Design a protein with these regions (language model features):
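A long, amphipathic alpha-helix that forms part
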Residues: 2-15, 31-72, 121, 219
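Acidic/histidine-rich catalytic neighborhood
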Residues: 69-70, 78-114, 252
Length: 256
C-alpha cells in the first residue's frame, strides 16, 4: 500500500534528530514490471508512470508538513526497449556446449571456455552470423568497461555474444517478455531518468547525459560524507555544477 509506505517515511523523519535517518531509499517497481510484461510503449506502462508520478507528489506533500530541508533524487537504473519475443534466438550452432560454459542470457551471453583451443575457431564461426555480434574482451567498446583490465573479479566470458535488436536470446521453452534492458548503454532506449530538487540543488537546469555512477559523489557531498575517489567509479565534477554551494560549516564524516 503506497499510503502506508509514505507514512512510514514520515514516521522515520519525525524521529528525534539524533535518531532520524539522513538518507531514505524508496523503490517503486510498477513501471519496470509493466514495461517488461507489455513493452515500454504500452498503455499499461503509461498508467504505471502516472501512478509513480502521483505517488511522488503524495510523498512530497506529506513530507512538506514536517518543514524539513528535504532533498529528492529521482532515478531509474536502466531503460527499456521492445524486443521480438516471437522470433527469439536459440543457442548459436557455432557454440559447442561441451567446450564452453554458457550461462543464461537474453541481451548478451558470456562464453566461458573449457578448452582454450576452441576460442578462436568459435569466434570465427560466430562472426559469420548476421544476427549477432561477437567480441573478444579486448575488442569490446571502451564505454562498456568489459575489457580484461576491467575484469577485476574475473566474471567476464572469453567471448561475449550480443544479439542485434530487436532480437534477443532465449534458451527456454517459455516465451520471453516483450520489454528488455541490458543492451548497449549508448542505445537511446537504454537511457535512464534523473531528476533532483530540494535546497541542495539549483533550480531549472537541464543537463547533458551522464553515467549513473556519478550520482554517488553528489549524494555523499550532500550528506557530508568523505570518500576515497580512487575507490569509486563516479566523479564529483560531472554533477557538481547542479549543486548549491555546500555550507563550510558542514562537517564531513569518514566513509571508508
Amino acid at each position: 500500500n503506497i499510503a502506508n509506505r509514505i507514512n512510514a517515511v514520515k514516521d522515520w523523519l519525525s524521529l528525534p534528530e539524533e535518531q532520524r535517518p539522513h538518507m531514505i531509499t524508496f523503490y517503486m517497481p510498477e513501471v519496470d514490471h509493466e514495461a517488461h510484461t507489455y513493452g515500454p510503449n504500452d498503455p499499461h506502462v503509461e498508467a504505471a508512470v502516472k501512478f509513480v508520478d502521483s505517488s511522488v507528489n503524495a510523498l512530497q506533500a506529506t513530507l512538506a508538513t514536517l518543514n524539513l530541508p528535504i532533498n529528492y533524487i529521482f532515478v531509474s537504473d536502466h531503460g527499456m526497449t521492445k524486443v521480438d519475443n516471437d522470433n527469439t534466438l536459440g543457442m548459436p550452432k557455432a557454440i559447442d556446449t561441451a567446450a564452453f560454459r554458457v550461462p543464461w542470457g537474453d541481451a548478451l551471453i558470456h562464453l566461458y571456455a573449457k578448452e582454450e583451443s576452441k576460442i578462436q575457431s568459435t569466434y570465427d564461426a560466430l562472426k559469420k552470423d548476421s544476427l549477432i555480434s561477437v567480441f573478444q574482451l579486448d575488442e569490446t567498446p571502451d564505454y562498456w568497461h568489459y575489457k580484461k583490465k576491467d575484469d577485476i573479479y574475473q566474471r567476464l566470458g572469453d567471448l561475449i555474444v550480443v544479439p542485434h535488436l530487436p532480437k534477443v536470446f532465449n534458451f527456454s521453452t517459455r516465451k520471453t517478455t516483450l520489454g528488455k534492458h541490458g543492451f548497449d548503454n549508448h542505445h537511446p532506449d537504454m537511457r535512464a531518468s534523473f531528476m533532483a530538487w530540494g535546497p541542495a540543488f539549483k533550480k531549472g537546469l537541464i543537463i547533458d547525459d551522464f553515467e549513473n555512477v556519478n550520482v554517488y559523489p553528489i549524494v555523499a557531498k550532500i550528506l557530508g560524507l568523505d570518500y576515497n575517489e580512487n575507490n569509486i567509479d563516479g566523479k564529483i565534477n560531472v554533477l557538481n555544477s547542479i549543486l548549491q554551494p555546500i555550507p563550510s560549516t558542514m562537517k564531513a564524516a569518514k566513509h571508508n
